[in-house]
Amino acid sequence: MDLNKIYEILYLLQDMRSFELYGTVGAVVCCLDSINYLTEDGDLEKTFRTVHNYLDPDGLILFDVNSPYKFREIYGYNSYILEDEIDGCSVYCGWQNSFDEKTGICDFYLTLFSENEDGTFSRCEEEQKEKMYTLEELKGALETCGFEFIGAYSGYGFEAVDEKTERYYIAARAKK
């Protein structure tokens, strides 16, 4: 069954700060802490303005972000070693974090080892960067860009956020 045909979903790969659509939509969903990857000044507002431009009146934006608690306490200057098995092959990840409280930027340094069929391992290194946003900053940017803040939730069950919430799930409505 082709879900794209059932739901008529058009998937596009574009920069979220300046994407273009062929009309308006009822909702925009941005997941996997993609908003945290907006690290330059003005990127957050630019993204929210672009989204607002393509939403129907009263359209929704739904997104998740890593919380300040997660940046400070979970990421911080911590290092992790993770291991898993995928399709019978071992995968190892060395993960180091460097968080700058002044800029709100966290640099992630990942070293991945994945087992090849012959038992040897391939190594891959990756660097990522995310920016911490407070709930107040997100609310302010949404309102500046023409949104009505609906709520922030902790988890998929719409629980209230608290000081130890690791991920905010946020909903806002476009005011037209």
Question: Where are the predicted features?
Answer:
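A short, glycine/Asx- and small/polar-enriched loop/turn
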Residues: 25, 104-106, 163-168
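Short alpha-helix adjacent to the SAM-binding motif of class I
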Residues: 1-3
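C-terminal lobe and adjacent flexible extensions of AdoMet/dcAdoMet transferase-like proteins
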Residues: 129-176
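A short SAM/SAH-binding and catalytic strip from SAM-dependent methyltransferases
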Residues: 25-43
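A short hydrophobic/small-residue beta-strand
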Residues: 61-62, 149
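SAM-dependent methyltransferase
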Residues: 62-139
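Conserved SAM-binding strand-loop segment of SAM-dependent methyltransferases
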Residues: 5-21
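A short glycine-rich, Lys/Arg-flanked "PGG" loop and its adjoining helix->strand segment in the class I
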Residues: 45-60
